[in-house]
Amino acid sequence: MSRVTLSRYLIEQTRSHNTPADLRFLIEVVARACKEISHAVSKGALGGVLGSMGTENVQGEVQKKLDVMSNEILLEANEWAGNLAGMASEEMDHPYQIPGRYPKGAYLLVFDPLDGSSNIDVNVSVGTIFSVLRCPNEYLNQNDTLREEAFLQPGTTQVAAGYAIYGPQTMLMLTLGNGVKGFTLDRELGSFVLTHDNISVPESTAEFAINMSNQRHWEAPVKRYVEELLAGKEGPLGKNYNMRWIASMVADVHRILTRGGVFMYPRDAREPEKPGKLRLMYEANPMSFIIEQAGGAATNGTQRILDIKPENLHQRVAVFLGSKQEVERITGYHKE
């Protein structure tokens, strides 16, 4: 039986689900950029790409060389293709304007070019997260500068989302709003090949992912929930749980997507003015879309993440996502 490449899958989606051709082309361009990033990541010290740039991004985080390189790869791959009205990235303060010499399209691309990059130097899996939105009609004027407001849409408006994970294999996880598919990069063929069909997150779990070193800074509902997990079979939940924490959202969520579990990045009392650590537009929204499409759930503790109306491009949010039963339990604790 012939293998299904990403290109073939997208063509079949156009035929069976009326996926627009320009969206198909956009996903293929993003996938090609991810292959290039994967190649750069795999070289490590041999490619001279480890270490920091000595600069900070808009969040005040030190930029790694690969952060900047990955950002440039995604911008250059997508700016000329004619599918996008604009782009936004974790590494840029403001939206990226499509150069006037290129045609513009109907979509917006938002991305974290290299999630988990603080782990690069220690050879831990990292990845690229992306979200695709439709550009509102009022912002489609070819001559106008695209404003940030065009991007400020709730996650429910996403038309596609995905992430590439650069680990022992390079994989692309993708949703077009009708389930989640997983593609593995065949390095000899040079193509992403469908290897995981109709991915589903188990409703209950025996694993959780959270940075326990911050426990003293959590809100009471999170402390209560984690204490119940740690109580094991003798506790109120009646079973033993294992904890996993990689400190790379892509890697942690990928494990939960394929094995089940709950990922938590709660608010922190050390920064009470911030509603969370992770960014809504290009981390929480695409991951929540993927998790929900796989049968899981995602909230900020009190509200479904995909229902949140963004107020700014780099807005932060608390995140609880994964197996539906566990996410509903901790969300219930927040509402008590």
UniProtKB/Swiss-Prot annotation:
Keywords: Carbohydrate metabolism, Cytoplasm, Hydrolase, Magnesium, Metal-binding. Its EC number is 3.1.3.11. Its main location: cytoplasm. Binds 2 magnesium ions per subunit. Mg(2+) 1 binds at residues 90, 112, 114. GO terms for cellular component: cytosol. Its cofactor is Mg(2+). Homotetramer. This is Fructose-1,6-bisphosphatase class 1.
